[in-house]
Amino acid sequence: MVVSISIRGSLLKVSGNPSRWGRLDNLFGLPTLDSCVSVFNTILAEIGLPQFTKCKRLMPGQAKENEKAPLVADGAIIKEVHITSNRAAGKGNEDDYISGLSTQPYRNSVPRLHSNGKSVDWLSKKGNVNLIYPTVYNKAHEMELHSLTKIKNRFSEQSREYNYLLDIISFCKENGVVRFEQKLKSRFLQKNALNYWGLSDYSILNKLHSDFLELDKKLSVNAMDFETISDHLVSSGVVETTRAANTTAMYAIQWFHGHVFDFNKKQVQTHRARLRKIGIDIAQKCNVSKFSPVIVKQTREIKVQECVAPSWYVRPSHLRVA
């Protein structure tokens, strides 16, 4: 893995994936931002460059007249952060699970299922990346596509390194590993005061990532027959009466058959809000091919669970705190 280091005046910049440094893979990466910076600091120390230090205070910088002075820190500034988690959907279930996720909006972004069915990402309605770039993808496929040939060419097909990577890919396939990843862009970090290493409170990212991982909580409706939507509305507590549920379910049936609604009408807004609580958005065009013939549960059925590293997996050896 390549780490890029650049120096301009007194500005030192390092970019790259620290969880891949000195490793064949990053299926299970570094647990904290501090451990990521620690890897960069180790690299800098080895080549005789100054290491990053934590911010201790913020000071007003220079500004033109009538302009607000920007804040200047006395330590390292974080420009981008990637948060990842692995989920095990079960052997052979990866693509169905990803297809199911592609029916769910996230943070006002629209899902886009890639043509090969191996990944889904979320973009703005104009097709742009906003403050965050979320994606979920088939991890075994990603490693076969981007890592396997490189490792074979570098170490040979008979090498221990190549066969170790094959074992990891087999593990991913046997467990149906899907990767949840969010790339937090610089503007997002600045907007939420998360760019000052040492001063910023990164605990809020736990809630952000938990919300992303819980996208599948509403997916059970995608495996239902439309006749059962009314029952699901009641059991989920969205409505209290069967009559109200049946009325809302009719909107879903009309949507399924291609009906276009007038969202300026109050009753349409009401029924859309109800249906969104169980994972159906009648404001988006119904794509029947995106509805996966499975039931997704946290506890053919997909049982999604935490992906635990096998005992033989080689963990990062550079986990000391920076």
Swiss-Prot record:
GO terms for biological process: DNA replication. It catalyses: ATP + (deoxyribonucleotide)n-3'-hydroxyl + 5'-phospho-(deoxyribonucleotide)m = (deoxyribonucleotide)n+m + AMP + diphosphate. One of its GO terms (molecular function) is DNA binding. It holds the Pfam family G2P_X_C. It comes from the Viruses. The keyword Nuclease applies. InterPro entries: G2P_C. Its EC number is 3.1.21.-, 6.5.1.1. Keywords: DNA replication, DNA-binding, Endonuclease, Hydrolase, Ligase, Nuclease. Belongs to the inovirus G2P protein family. Isoform G2P plays an essential role in viral DNA replication. Binds the origin of replication and cleaves the dsDNA replicative form I (RFI) and becomes covalently bound to it via phosphotyrosine bond, generating the dsDNA replicative form II (RFII). In turn, viral DNA replication initiates at the 3'-OH of the cleavage site. After one round of rolling circle synthesis, protein G2P is linked to the newly synthesized ssDNA and joins the ends of the displaced strand to generate a circular single-stranded molecule ready to be packed into a virion. This is Replication-associated protein G2P. It comes from Escherichia phage If1 (Bacteriophage If1).
